[in-house]
A protein has these predicted regions:
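A short, hydrophobic/aromatic-rich structural module that often spans a beta strand
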Residues: 124-128, 134-151, 187-191, 198, ...
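Active-site/acyl-donor-binding loops of N-acyltransferases
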Residues: 2-13, 79, 157-180, 308-377
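Short, high-confidence coil segments that cap the C-terminus of an alpha-helix
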Residues: 58-60, 130-133, 249, 306
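Active-site catalytic microenvironments for nucleophilic, acid-base chemistry
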Residues: 127, 225, 300, 304
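A conserved beta-strand-loop-helix scaffold within acyl/acetyltransferase catalytic domains
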Residues: 14, 18-85, 142-286
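Conserved acetyl-CoA binding element of GNAT-fold acetyltransferases
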Residues: 86-108, 271-282, 312
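Aromatic (often tryptophan-rich) hydrophobic motifs at membrane interfaces
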Residues: 118, 239, 245-356
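A gly/proline- and charged-residue-enriched helix-loop-helix capping module
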Residues: 93-147
Length: 377
């Protein structure tokens, strides 16, 4: 009998099958096995994104690739509608940002991977033509196993498929180190703030075994208070609560004298974690709340064998494809204080409309040129 990989090599055709809810389970099972996937590829994140910005009229066009009866790849894909200079334009995006790049099966040879990727992007191009999509953008996660399984520096893989580079950088902390080593790699001020915070307040982790609706509701209400408004649909908070209940996230909480000071929600998947969301009581801005939230989360993640923690994007200064505000620069500086290394956040885009391409690139050039002379962080 032939091995599955050999059978797939012999099969020429790759069939595209739209993702429907009855296939959610096998899609998510595939995500657990693909070297290219992380939480962003799952139906959990897909459903969250479909609820995140309803004004964009998001619609899933996600699809699977089947070859010789087996799933060989998945492509999360959402079409969203934007208003730009008085016109409505469709894009393949994820809640206003780049979507997860295709993920392939772990048993494919290099030759078959190329064939499958060619089929995937041909289908994306076909959908773009049918729907008159102006632009498609994808990103790859540094928490996916394939990102780390390389022996030499790599170029953005999506450039091979007709996409243009819009990559950024993100900070990833290696949690396999001992706690004292992690502390030594932090900025001196961060270590001092963690020590001070530990003496002032209580930090707790709510996971699937300890989260309750009442505890999560406290996070949602503080999130509203900190932002001064409700920032997104209630359904997205319910989904986050379900993630914690299902072991896909944890909630780091800080209290002082029985009052909530802050929360941080950390997505957890496979052997990686991502700093997804946080809020702090604006009445206590003088306290190092964020420092203790992150440190307590890192301790929990280490305890449960999470190896990599992506604390978030690094914005040192503006790029043509991303203008950095002072607030974003300060947030990046805060995140770097916890140590770790800056790694590529591979992102890529492809324009399907020449007029839309010209408008976007001219707009970027005007905004970027206005930043010339700004200080570099």
């Amino acid at each position: 009998m032939q091995e599955p990989s050999q059978t797939l090599e012999a099969a020429e055709s790759v069939t595209v099958v739209p993702l429907t809810q009855d296939r959610y389970s096998e899609w998510d099972q595939f995500c657990l096995q693909s070297p290219d996937s992380w939480f962003w590829h799952t139906t959990h994140w897909l459903e969250y994104t479909l609820q995140f910005r309803p004004e964009l009229q998001p619609r899933s066009l996600s699809f699977l690739c089947i070859q010789a009866g087996a799933i060989v790849a998945i492509c999360p894909l959402i079409v969203e509608t934007y208003q730009h200079e008085g016109e409505y334009v469709r894009e393949f995006s994820y809640g206003g940002d780049a979507g997860p790049a295709p993920a392939l099966a772990d048993f494919l040879s290099d030759k078959t991977r190329k064939r499958v990727l060619r089929r995937i992007f041909a289908h994306v191009d076909q959908l773009a033509d049918e729907l008159r999509v102006g632009r498609a953008s994808f990103r790859m996660s540094p928490l996916a196993p394939s990102f780390s399984n390389v022996t030499a520096p790599q170029m953005n893989p999506m450039l091979k498929w007709g996409f243009n580079d819009i990559s950024l950088a993100t900070q990833v902390i290696d949690l396999t180190a001992e706690e004292q080593q992690l502390l030594r790699k932090m900025r001196k001020g961060h270590r001092a703030d963690i020590t001070r915070a530990a003496k002032l307040m209580q930090a707790t982790i709510f996971d699937k075994d300890s989260i309750t609706h009442e505890r999560f509701e406290r996070y949602r209400l503080l999130h509203k208070k900190a932002a001064g408004r409700v920032t997104r649909p209630l359904a997205t908070f319910q989904m986050m609560y379900d993630w914690i209940r299902n072991g896909l996230a944890i909630l780091s909480a800080a209290r002082l004298n029985g009052s909530d000071l802050g929360f941080a929600l950390i997505s957890v998947y496979r052997d990686g974690a991502y700093y997804s969301s946080s809020c702090e009581d604006p009445d206590h801005k003088n306290l190092p709340i964020g420092h203790i939230l992150q440190w307590r989360a890192m301790q929990w993640l280490r305890q449960f064998s999470i190896r990599k923690y992506e604390i978030g994007m690094q914005a040192h200064h503006s790029q043509p494809h991303m203008i950095v505000s002072n607030k974003e620069s300060n947030i990046s500086f805060f995140k770097r204080g916890f140590g770790g290394d800056a790694v590529p956040l591979w992102r890529a885009e492809k324009f399907y409309s020449r007029p839309y391409c010209l408008r976007i690139l001219r707009e970027r050039a005007e905004k970027f040129s206005a930043t010339m002379g700004e200080a570099v962080d």
